[in-house]
Amino acid sequence: MKKELFALKGMICYSKNQREMVFMEDSYVVCENGICAGVFSQLPEEYKDVPVEDLGNRLIIPGFTDLHLHAPQYAYRGTGMDLELLDWLNTITFPQEARYADLSYAKKAYSIFVDDLKHSFTTRACIFATLHRPATELLMDMLEESGLATMVGKVNMDRNGSPELQEESAQASAADTRQWLEDIKRRYDHTYPILTPRFTPSCTDELMTELGKIQKEYHVPVQSHLSENFGEIAWVKELCPTSRFYGDAYDMFGLFGTKNAESELDYTAASANSNSCPTIMAHCVHSTDEEIQMIKDQGVYIAHCPESNTDIASGIAPIRRYLDMGLHVGLGTDVAGGFSLSMFRAIADTIQVSKLRWRLMDQNLAPVSYTHLR
């Protein structure tokens, strides 16, 4: 494979860690096969002959990672803000996602989504597709061509959907998921599969059992939703009465992080360790103390989605508490609960809603500031 190597010159800004920002004027960042090989005030001898694009005094920053968004929902972003989660799903989301059974519609809608994502400041993303395997593979093909680094999930749901948006059985859902994973095996360089049970109310115990087996068989990460809305949490308790809390309804099937976790959220790490289950859970707005402890112990990543949590009135997650506890927290736009792909907006929203939580709900928990979001 031909080696791709080039350098950018300009004002470089990046964070070494949460507390240390680096600013370098008139400096170079070297890119090798899509990965940053280093940042230098002067080009080292080994890179002296690489092509350089001089950007003058323009700012060069790392791309953002959007930890949670729904590609099929981009077509109707900004609608349904008068509804809460469950009504929003039934009234708007499920009927719209059913349209992706039509590949011609999926191609048109996903083309717009991928193009807009490519021209945003996001370079990595964890993405929900729909339950439709052909449309999901189409989306992955488009994302691969875009050059973005993504994880994409074919959604699983065998209950509480709609006649047009529900898989016929747990066995059918599991079989289609296995077929999807086989179809895309070794097909992409920077587009990866991620197992995607929509959320507990959409998946029977039988399906969750099958997904647990698939996770161990294929060593894929997992993404889903957790403790987003009071009505959702109560519903999970009705559907899974033996679960101690919402997260336990995933954990009992081996779909909630890694016991004694120390691993990073890395697809290759998941592949190398048969006991590893890197997991992203979106929202965690109303997580109990016991659930939070399991999130910490098992290395589950929280995708904080402040715009969505505001738009559909879910609440304000205690993000400062999670950060102080050392939990893994990232940001998501959660389109179309959120209406914008802008991660700059997600950063600003995180700070704003954290201040509102401090002022209106809990003055013992300080708000976050930009220093927490580097």
Task: Name each model feature, range by range.
Residues K2-E4, C13-P62:
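Histidine-rich, glycine-flanked metal-binding segment
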Residues V30, R77-L148, A172-R187:
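Alpha-helical scaffold segments that flank or form the walls of functional sites
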Residues L131, N156-D158, F199-P201, E228-F230, ...:
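Active-site-proximal loop/turn and secondary-structure-junction residues that shape catalytic pockets
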Residues L138-A282:
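Metal-coordinating catalytic core of metallo-dependent amide/deamination hydrolases
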Residues K216-Y218, S276, K296-A303, M325-V329:
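Glycine-enriched alpha-helix->loop->beta-strand junction motifs that scaffold or abut catalytic
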Residues V222-N229, I312-S314, R320-A346:
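Short acidic/histidine-rich active-site segments
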Residues T371-R374:
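Conserved small/polar residues in nucleotide/adenosyl-binding loops
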